[in-house]
A protein has these predicted regions:
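Active-site-adjacent segment of SDR/Rossmann-fold oxidoreductases
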Residues: 41, 45, 66-78
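Conserved active-site helix of classical SDR/Rossmann-fold NAD(P)-dependent CH-OH oxidoreductases
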Residues: 13, 58-65, 69, 157
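Active-site YXXXK catalytic motif of short-chain dehydrogenase/reductase
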Residues: 53, 57
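Residue(s) in the substrate-gating loop at a strand-loop-helix junction
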Residues: 36
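A short, exposed helix-loop element centered on a Lys and neighboring polar residues
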Residues: 16-17
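Substrate-binding pocket helix/loop in short-chain dehydrogenase/reductase
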Residues: 1-2
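SDR active-site lid
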Residues: 73-170, 174
Length: 215
């Protein structure tokens, strides 16, 4: 929990602290912080806890929004944007275990963590072999990258266009835009099963949150 929160929140915070003096000293600057759709909707589906990541992304969004006024007062030439991507096709599923645990030494820890999550979600994972779990992890990582509606290159283009237009709020992907509208239209229902069903019916986040019949 602490490591996820530290990377996703303090990584942004300390990055801003490290570069702020240089930004203020420049003639013009633009600070771009990456939050997530989980910065305004704190789940990835029913029965899947997502607390540490969502808390960090909410923090990034709130911090970035607060900086808008702060910088208008103290450094009006420095602009701020907060980026909220939806499902973007990256290799994060492959790279995260390598960075956090190492290529080989961390395989056992990855299997143990994955087995625990699957059992907690009600999947019969006790008798599944380590090799099968590692294969499943690789398949999921590939599916996350390859089934995304927005590529990493497209996401970069959307972000740069938003910065050029000096938009402080940049939603990345049609799925992010749809989710934002849905949450705003019915905030009290944002964590109900029907809310997720509405997203699936509209064709958004189907790879990340499959229907109950596909779990």
């Amino acid at each position: 929990w602490e490591k996820t929160f530290a990377v996703c929140w303090y990584g942004v915070y300390y990055g801003c602290r490290a570069f702020m003096s240089a930004l203020v000293a420049s003639d013009g600057a633009h600070l771009v912080n990456v939050s997530s759709v989980n910065g305004f909707w704190a789940t990835i589906g029913e029965g899947v806890p997502h607390t540490a990541y969502s808390a960090a992304k909410f923090a990034v969004k709130g911090f970035s929004e607060a900086l808008i006024t702060d910088l208008k007062v103290h450094a009006p030439h420095v602009k701020v944007s907060v980026v909220m991507p939806g499902h973007i096709g990256t290799s994060i599923g492959f790279n995260t275990p390598k960075v956090l645990r190492g290529d080989n030494a961390g395989a056992a820890a990855q299997v143990q963590s994955m087995r625990k999550r699957l059992l907690g979600a009600g999947f019969p994972a006790a008798d599944v072999s380590d090799e099968q779990l590692l294969k499943l992890a690789a398949e999921r990582a590939a599916a996350f990258r390859d089934s995304a509606p927005t590529t990493a290159a497209q996401a970069a283009g959307i972000i740069l266009d938003g910065v050029r237009a000096q938009r402080w709020r940049i939603l990345v992907g049609a799925d992010a835009e749809y989710l934002d509208k849905l949450v705003r239209a019915a905030p009290e229902h944002a964590y109900e099963s029907s809310f997720i069903d509405d997203m699936r019916a509209a064709g958004h986040f189907t790879a990340l949150m499959p229907g109950k019949d596909k779990r």
